[in-house]
């Protein structure tokens, strides 16, 4: 049985400038599967929820840095998110992955270096 669920987002300069990211299908499915009662289906238009997560800063369980993933819905219903500290860690072209580790019940945020986007 799979021990993890994942979501992936390719970071753009606009995401970094605005600190707001449109939730793609993988993010919506990730939240729905990992946190069924906290997902976008349970956020009213104009509301938000906060999930505790951890940046993977190395290969050791003890090298994770706490962060927050904020899930939002605009008044018209658009699904958005922001990740605390992302602008200090990522650049346009990087790929951000959310991974749910069922064993520890943690969301791990990983950044993969990508090509620069202009």
Role assignments for model-derived ranges:
Residues 1-118:
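Acidic, low-complexity intrinsically disordered regions
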